[in-house]
Amino acid sequence: VYAELGKHQNATADYLSLIFHRYLNGEGRNPLTIMVNNYKLTGLDPFLENHRKTNVRRKIEIPIKDSEGKEQIVSVQPFVLPFQKDLSAKDKRLSGGIENYRAKQGFYIYRNKRLIIWGTWFGRHRDELTKYARIKVDIPNSLDDIWGIDIKKQHATIPAIIRNRLTKAVDEAMDLAVKAQTYRGRVEKVDEKVDYIWDRIKERDNQFVYRINRNSRIF
């Protein structure tokens, strides 16, 4: 019984740490305190914004008219997360766990900084090569009816009026993620006249790896 209760407690803590992570981390205000059985929650960071290898893209502001005709702003910011090999144990915990690191690609929709839906492309193709792309979307509560946000604040749909305007930001992030996944480094040779058995390859992080040169005449 206690083991089962412990599982539910951990699941609840993880859920709240993600949903309210921007409040818990004190974004734009004093940090919110949430306790679960005397355990103080720490906010997660699904974008790993402070990681040196996170590719943080420019924030885009999209003006949208609400149901009363008043202009409101929807902000969109793409992120391309680091490779798993570049993550510390703390990074893995902050991102929500390594099991979700690849699976939860896509949009992260916030209503007044509260996460309401995440890890979806809203019908766009989910690709192995874009597994590190995540798009932060901030919407004000004045656009609830346009976004189709339900009373539980758990579901939202992208309105047709801004779907096309989001495409550019999404495609940019996905292109970056694909390039990061398909980059294989640059082969460096000390002497072009030498038929090396091993290729010395410089990767993005200035580290070197060695691979068999299968174009060598020896093979």
Whereabouts are the PLM-identified features?
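Charged regulatory segments coupled to nucleotide-binding catalytic modules in large multidomain enzymes
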Residues: 4, 8-10, 43-45, 50-219
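GHKL-type ATPase core
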Residues: 1-36
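Flexible loop/N-cap segments at domain edges
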Residues: 39
